[in-house]
């Protein structure tokens, strides 16, 4: 699922840029505009995954956003599937059935069966 929301960027008097996503009530910042955009995308990913996991609906993106003088409004997107894949490092235990001779050969060769299985699944799924 992809989310696209307007983000308000304003210069911070202390330096850098502030980013505010009004539809998700997110505030973040960056040292420059590029980093502020990246941080807004990251924050949207975190909040979006939490909402998705909790079964909460996503608000519709605002069509009109009031922007303070000197501010910039820009649409920022985040792909929640890609974000989750890139940031979720949790592993799960899964039992696999193998012929005993294949298991013995893998052990004898010192192979990491879990790593090989992960690589094969990623290749099969094109991820």
Question: What positions do the PLM features span?
Answer:
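Short, charged, surface-exposed hinge/linker loops at domain edges
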Residues: 1-4, 41-97, 101-109, 115, ...
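A short, exposed loop/beta-hairpin motif centered on an aromatic-Gly-Thr core
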Residues: 24-34, 95
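Short aromatic-glycine-(Arg/Gly/Cys) micro-motifs in beta-strand/loop hairpins
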Residues: 8-23
């Amino acid at each position: 699922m992809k989310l696209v929301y307007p983000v308000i960027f304003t210069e911070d008097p202390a330096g850098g840029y502030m980013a505010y996503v009004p539809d998700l009530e997110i505030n973040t910042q960056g040292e420059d505009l590029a980093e502020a955009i990246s941080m807004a995308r990251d924050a949207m990913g975190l909040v979006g995954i939490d909402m998705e996991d909790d079964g909460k609906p996503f608000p519709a993106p605002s069509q009109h956003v009031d922007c303070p003088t000197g501010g910039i409004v820009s649409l920022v997107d985040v792909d929640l599937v890609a974000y989750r894949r890139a940031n979720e490092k949790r592993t799960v235990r899964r039992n696999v059935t193998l012929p005993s001779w294949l298991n013995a050969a893998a052990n004898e060769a010192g192979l990491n069966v879990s790593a090989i299985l992960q690589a094969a699944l990623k290749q099969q799924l094109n991820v």
